[in-house]
């Protein structure tokens, strides 16, 4: 009898262990094993990264990257036609007369510049960083943090590329005198604590940025900003992630066109991934693994095309829906006219997407500069290397 009981006990122990293993496998973090640090040979998994990442000579030909943008921001060349400017000083003590060698000194120059960094840096901006036209901020090769101070402001500018930075813990900073360009000092009000703020600007490409914990938005684009691509970025730990269009009265935002491609919207995000007004927004092959209220929201007739994305809903039954329409400004009859399309998206853990408007629009917009979506089953691979990269000179990135 004792032997029989031992055998029964062992049997049930094995059953429990097997069940625990299966449960653990089912509840592996949402990015699963793909989020572990990769140590193998270079793998460029999406169309943008394939353009430059696995070239071991990327550091000798940095400006090749300017040919790699896709989507609505594909014409952004940044400082491709200019010289290299090296940031050697991480200070930001004088915002009216910034020192040569600082990041602030580089971004206000009249000439096109490809701005790189001479070492690992943690930069605390005393005031918002005003980036003028024809500039690239290229953090490849070093770990560059913009942290614990103001964020980046792109205002009335064009041809901007921002790549491979870690932007986090951004806070509002007070108003006052600030050099806005090489030959102009302006009196500015306080800022809101955005990570990157785009105001009345065009031809912008933001790529491979790791962002978390700003005060207002991580990335906001307003005041008729257009022709923007945000790609290969990793977002975590924030409430209101992206705002495209500041209010429901600024109708000039109808010309806004923004591409989101190959981004990972990760842990502890709440809403606005993005929140859109008026314009045309193409969301392609992004990985939405967390949202607490909603993922994609909008109003004022925004057109939203979601293609080949992966949406993994939270377990909470009340937040399975991906989309949110601002019902205070529109009746059901009105928002049902807004064209929101889900095409080839992967809906997991009960996620739902409520479509509306012209579901045949994709057949009518071949002339637009849209990234061709890959199957949503590949999203985990396409976004595997999202966020700032750890690039080493002389090796594939």
UniProtKB/Swiss-Prot annotation:
GO biological process, one term: pectin catabolic process
Enzyme class: lyase
Pathway: Glycan metabolism; pectin degradation; 2-dehydro-3-deoxy-D-gluconate from pectin: step 2/5
Keyword set includes Lipid metabolism: no
Active site: 272
Note on how the cofactor is bound: Binds 1 Ca(2+) ion. Required for its activity.
Keywords on record: Calcium, Glycoprotein, Lyase, Metal-binding, Signal
SMART domains: Amb_all (SM00656)
Family: Belongs to the polysaccharide lyase 1 family.
Name the UniProt record assigns to this protein: Pectate lyase
Organism encoding this protein: Nicotiana tabacum (Common tobacco)
Origin organism lineage: Eukaryota, Viridiplantae, Streptophyta, Embryophyta, Tracheophyta
């Amino acid at each position: 009898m004792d032997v029989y009981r031992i055998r029964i006990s062992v049997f049930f122990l094995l059953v429990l262990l097997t069940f625990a293993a299966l449960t653990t496998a089912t509840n592996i973090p949402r990015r699963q094993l793909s989020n572990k640090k990769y140590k193998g040979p270079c793998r460029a998994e999406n169309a943008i990264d394939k353009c430059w990442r696995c070239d071991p000579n990327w550091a000798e030909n940095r400006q090749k990257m300017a040919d790699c943008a896709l989507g609505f921001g594909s014409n952004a060349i940044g400082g491709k036609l200019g010289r290299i400017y090296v940031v050697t000083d991480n200070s930001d003590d004088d915002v009216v007369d910034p020192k040569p060698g600082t990041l602030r000194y580089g971004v206000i120059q009249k000439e096109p510049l490809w701005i790189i960094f001479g070492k690992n840096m943690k930069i605390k901006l005393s005031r918002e960083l005003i980036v003028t036209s024809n500039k690239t901020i290229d953090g490849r090769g070093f770990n560059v943090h913009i942290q614990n101070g103001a964020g980046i402001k792109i205002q009335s500018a064009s041809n901007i590329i921002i790549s491979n930075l870690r932007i986090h813990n951004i806070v509002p900073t007070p108003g006052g005198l600030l050099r806005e360009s090489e030959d102009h000092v302006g009196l500015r009000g306080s800022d809101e604590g955005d990570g990157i703020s785009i105001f009345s600007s065009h031809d912008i490409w933001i790529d491979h940025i790791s962002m978390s914990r700003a005060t207002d938005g991580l990335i906001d684009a307003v005041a008729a900003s257009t022709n923007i691509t945000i790609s290969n970025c990793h977002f975590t730990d924030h409430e209101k992630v992206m705002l495209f269009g500041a209010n429901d009265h600024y109708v000039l935002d109808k010309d806004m066109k923004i591409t989101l491609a190959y981004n990972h919207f990760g842990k502890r995000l709440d809403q606005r991934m993005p929140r859109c007004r008026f314009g045309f927004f193409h969301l392609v092959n992004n990985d939405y693994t967390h949202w607490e209220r909603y993922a994609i929201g909008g109003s004022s007739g925004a057109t939203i095309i979601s293609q080949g994305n992966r949406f993994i809903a939270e377990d909470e039954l009340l937040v399975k829906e991906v989309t949110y329409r601002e019902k205070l400004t529109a009746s059901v009859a009105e928002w049902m006219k807004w064209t929101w399309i889900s095409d080839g998206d992967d809906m997991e853990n009960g996620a739902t997407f409520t479509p509306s408007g012209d579901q045949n629009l994709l057949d009518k917009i071949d002339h637009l500069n849209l990234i061709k979506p890959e199957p949503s089953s590949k999203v985990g691979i396409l976004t595997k290397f999202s966020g700032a990269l750890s690039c080493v000179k002389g090796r594939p990135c």
